[in-house]
Amino acid sequence: MTARFAWLLVGVLAGAALVAIPWESTSDAGTGPATIRITDRLLSLKRVDIGARGTSPGDVEVVRHRLYDRTRARNVIGRAELVCHFVDTRRSRSCRGTYILPRGKIVVGGAIQYHQFYVLAVTGGTGLYDNARGTLTVTRTARRPVRDLVVFRLAG
């Protein structure tokens, strides 16, 4: 009878341990409310003309930036890569991009009409920015060389 009770106790404890294990993986890397202010410098802007000559729907724009610490302008902290598809014959583009920072990546997306000022949605990230949500605001600060103020407002 004692052996049976011991095995029953082991079974109950094992079952309780299985119930305590979460079935869905969640991240502990929540970013919480935060504002990140950095600057960038344009490295390259390439256009791929697809279809009709000149700007037309489907044309692709590939943009690369070097990212800098705002307080120490010479300190490179990462890079940004965006791919945009033109949706009309003027300036409207649908863009997706990744900002690679020292502690993770931030993924953004949305519409850009002018490179001088735009706001994109933060749709996720990795590392410290896992599951990040919020907005990215980019404001042009210089034309030659092209420099921008980059502000992430993260909600979590």
Q: What does each model-identified segment do?
A:
Residues 9-10, 14, 19, 121, ...:
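Compositionally biased amphipathic helical and low-complexity segments enriched in hydrophobic
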